[in-house]
Amino acid sequence: LCSISFDPETRRFGHQVDTLYSSEQATVQITGAEHKSASFPRVSPDGKQLVFTLSEYGNFSIWHKDADLYRIDLDSGVMHRMDEVNSDDVESYHSWSSNSRWLVFSSRRIDGLYTRPYLVHIDENGKTGKPFVLPQEDPDFYSRFMFSYNIPEFVKGKVEAEVHTIADTARKPGNRIRMEK
């Protein structure tokens, strides 16, 4: 997992690449984190922490029971397994709140089948609270709802887009970027 600077005005990447996570580093810091694939790196909006998913292999960690969340303190470079957050089943995609104090993440901890959105508070020192499933008005909602929340995201306001508009946008080609040597 590497970091490289990017200038949005010129749309150019920098030249220096910094390694944030490598399997060799993980071997030294955390037993059991060696030789795994890192995916979904997300830097907190305050720039102090980075949370990512580690799994045995590949990029679709939502299908890997071993997938867990890890955190790197970006000031010290120290990596932490998020034991308070992880369960015996999948923890995968995640998103920060705008104030860097909440994380929403996908987990299959209830039944191992469907992915549910969990929230956890993270204080300014990186200490996490106890995760909880996103509350619903009906207490039986999750036992009857047969869909997965694979990619939970925080939003600041009402989403006012029609389904067909979102689908049309998703079908459009992405923006091209250019890398120079």
Predicted segments with their positions:
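Sequence signature of WD/YWTD-type beta-propeller architectures
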Residues: L1-K181
